[in-house]
Amino acid sequence: MDHFARVSLVAALLYTNTWAKTVRETLRITWEEGAPNGQQRELIYINGRFPGPNLVWDEDDDVEVTVINDMTQSVTVHWHGLDQRPIQPGDSFVHKFKAFPPGNHWYHSHQKMSLVDGLYGAVHVRPKGDRKGLWSQISQDDKDIEAMEKAACDPEYLVVSDWSQYTSDEYWKISNDSGLPVFCLDSILVNGKGEVYCPGQKFLQGELAPGVLDAFPPGTEVSDKGCFSPALDRIKGGPWNMTERPDLIPPHVETGCVASRHENETIVVDPGRNNGWVSMHIVAAATIAQIAISFDSHKFWLYEVDGNYVNPREYFSAIISAGETFSIMMKLDQEPGRYTVRIPNTGASQVFSAFAEMVYKGHEENDKKLGEARLSYGGVPTSPEIKNNSYFPWKLDTDHMSPWPPSTPRPGNADEEHLLVLGRVGSPNNHTMNAKYLYPLGFRDEEPLLFYPNATLGTENEGLLLRTRNASWVDLIMQVSTLAGDEVAFKHFIHKHGGKTWRIGFGTGVWNYSSVQEAIQARPNDFNLETPGFRDTWITAPSASGEKHWSVLRYYVDNPGPWLLHCHIELHLMGGMGMVIMDGVDAWPDQLPEQYRLGKRL
C-alpha cells in the first residue's frame, strides 16, 4: 500500500503543499485479552477495539495521527511512508502527512511480527476528482454512474486477516526452536470475527485444489487442520546443515484441531440506496494466507487494486494476497435475503476457510440462506464458468489489470537495473531479497537511515541497501528458485514502500541477460510496456518442481526517501526477506525538522 507515497518525510520538505483541512486522529494501542475466534489469547487493541478503527479522509487533507503506546513492548504504526524509531512503551508520536493518493489503503505494524497480534485497520481516502470514466465502463446509465460514485465514497469495509492462537513472539519461537517452517493457522477473520472449523481430515484432503498433491510424494496427506507437515522436503527445502526438532512444535499447532463457535461478520446492504449498487473495500491484513472471496449468486466488478484504479472487470471470485487491497462494485439484483460470503485460503499452505453473511436490508431476521456457492471450502471454483470468470494473481490476463486513467512506464532501457535473487539461505526460516543478505527487522532502529544515510557505506550492511538517483527510471529484476536448497519455492508477496511499480516482464528460466532491453528483444511475449499493471505488491511465481521464474518491475524515482522492499509474509520478513531502497538519495535534504525525530538521541 504505498498509500501516502508522495507525502513522505523527505518529500514533504521538497514540495509545497496546498492548503486543506486538518484532520486529527488518536490511536491508543493496548495489549489485552480477547477471543476473536472464540478462543482466548492476548492481542493488540486500538482505541479499545480489534481490528483498529477505519480511518476516512478526503484527498489532500492534512492528517495528524497521534499514536500512544500503552503496551509494554515497542511498536510502530506504519503508513507505508514514514521512517522512524519504534515508539517505546509509554511514549507517543504524531504522524503528519497529506491524505494522498485517493483510494483504499490500510495501516499496520512493522515492528517484529506484531501484525500477527492484530495491529491493523482500513484507510479510505475519498477522491476529489471525477471518476465518470471509470464507472461508465460498468454501466452507461447516468443514474448508475452517479450511484456508483456515491457508493464508492461510502463503502463497506472488509478487513480480512488470518489468525493463530499463538502470539507473534510465541509463533516465531516455535519456528525457530523446531528449525522448521511452521505456517499452520487457526482461523480467517473478517473485521475481527470468525470461528475455528474442524470438518475432519478426510474432508480437508478432498478439498485440496487440483494439482496440489502432484508436488508431493504419493500418499502425502494434510492434517486435521488442513496443513502439510513442515518436515516434508517440499516444504522445508534444503538439505540444510542444521538440526530439526519437530518434537518442539506444541500440540494443536499443526495437528489436533479444536473447534470453537463464535460470531461471523454480517454485512447489511441496502438495495434501495445508490440505485442498488454497493462498494466494498477489502484489506488483506493476512500474515501468510492467500485468500479468495466470493458472494453466493452475486458477481462484482473489481475496480481498484492497491489503492490504484484499474479498468474494471467483472468476476465471480477473486484471490487477494497478504498486503493487498481490492475495491469492488456490486449490483444488488438478486432475491432479497441472506447470502453467504465465502473466504477460503487458496494457497498450498493450508486448507481452511471463513464465512460471513451479506444480508439485504429488511431481512436481518430471516435465517434462510439463499444463493449458490461460487467457491468450495478449499477455494476451488464450483464450475468451469466460475473458474473462467475469476481473478487469479498467477494468470497474466487477469493479473495485469491496466491502470485507469492510463499510466505507462518509459519504454526501452531504464537508467538503473538491479538483479535481486530471492529465496531461502542456510535454513528453512532464513529468507533473503538479494542472494545472501538477511535483513534484521531491528536494522537501524536507533539510528534510522533517514537521519544517517551514509552510515552503512564501506560496511557489509551496504548489501542490505540499494541507492537510486532522483528522477531516474529503475528496473528491479527478481529471480526465484535458483538458490541452493530453495529450488522448490513458495510464492512471495513483494511489496515496495514509497511508490508503486509497473510489472513489465514475467517469465520462466534463469535471468541471464545483460539488460532488460536485451531480454525484451529475445522474449517479446514475456513483456508488456503498453498496458502493464501498476501497484505496490506483486506475487512471485511458486515453483512446485524446481522451475525458475523472474519478474521485472519498473518505476520512476520521484519520491525521495528510505523505503523498505520486502515480502509481506510475516515469517519471511522476520526471517530476513527485506532490504532498503534509498530512492533519490542525492535529493535528500541536509536538515530534517525536529518533529520528525523520536527521542533525544537522534
Curated annotation (Swiss-Prot):
GO terms for molecular function: copper ion binding; oxidoreductase activity. Keywords: Copper, Glycoprotein, Metal-binding, Oxidoreductase, Repeat, Signal. Cu cation 2 binds at residues 80, 108, 568. Glycans are attached at residues 176, 241, 264, 388, 430, 454, 470, 512. InterPro entries: Cu-oxidase-like_N, Cu-oxidase_2nd, Cu-oxidase_C, Cu-oxidase_fam, Cu_oxidase_CS, Cu_oxidase_Cu_BS, Cupredoxin. Its EC number is 1.10.3.-. Binds 4 Cu cations per monomer. Gene3D superfamilies: Cupredoxins - blue copper proteins (2.60.40.420). One of its GO terms (cellular component) is cell surface. Its cofactor is Cu cation. Disulfide bonds: none annotated. It is an enzyme of class 1 (oxidoreductase). It is found in: Cell surface. This is Laccase 1.
